[in-house]
Amino acid sequence: PILATVLKEILNKNKINNTQLLNIKKIIKKINKFHEWLIQFRDPKKTGLVSILHPWESGYDNSPLWDEPMKKVKIEKNIKYKRGDNKVVNPDYRPLDIDYDRYVTIKNNLKKMKYNPKKVYKSSFFNVVDVGFNSIFLKANKDLVILLDKFNLNKTKINNYIKLTEKNFLKLYDKKKESFFSKDIRNNQKIFIPSITNYFVLFADLNNDKINKKLIKSLKRYNPKNKYFFSSIKPNHKSFEEKRYWRGPVWINCNWFIHKGLKNKDWFFSEKIKKKTIQILEKKGFFEYFSCKNGQPMGAKNFSWSAALYLDLMLNKN
């Protein structure tokens, strides 16, 4: 849910005429409705934290974050589907067939409920409060408030939700490990997997300097021995796989989120991440993801979000 953040950036960097402003106001109203929809249907208990109901909603499909919740998904009998992803990309880099069995099982269950938002929260085979998703949503809500204020639209509901999120986000923090961890709502279990997405909290600008400093300290220990960073999973963890999709490789968007989040907290570290990210793209090409050990490019070639974020890093000096 990053639309509000992107739109705020567009408005900050461009001259907008009156006709465009009218259209943008309509877009902001639609974004506001989307955010209110997420709050209503993905956080029915009003905790300040929204759930994802399928690993695909996170964007990091086969992350080890989902291993335990997914193990509890009973695969549908006689399940039928055709994979195309492992035909165009090396299968060793892609999720396993058993992963897809579970993805499709979850999807088919949602389909049986006709994706009714009132039903799926309770009945989905997968229900996780993800740190990464909620970090992006918190930042988007903060940016949405700025947009609503700019166009004299009501911001009370979103403002109140931000306060609730700021308060309850801390329940996901582990003092000993100095990191945030997602929670499996369906099985009522914390997910103690060292994923780089746990550090997206820095992007959310959580109003807690003490925790932010501890997060940065922890992040600097994440994979210091590797030339390329950040690996999607901490390299010394048992679930780490150097080349398999979201189980180890470096993703440009993860670096981008953390670079942006550190700019007003540790500028030098932020610039280091920016420099290293630009270097790997210029040296290895615009691929989907890369090995943290040797920078080997993997996945799809000419990958658009790698290219788009490269442009953003190159053109944004602030």
Task: Please report, for each region that a protein language model flagged, where it lies by residue.
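Short, local alpha-helical segments
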Residues: 239-244, 255-257, 261
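C-terminal transactivation domains of fungal Zn(2)-Cys(6)
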Residues: 113-168
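Internal, well-ordered domain-core segments that constitute the primary functional module
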Residues: 2-70
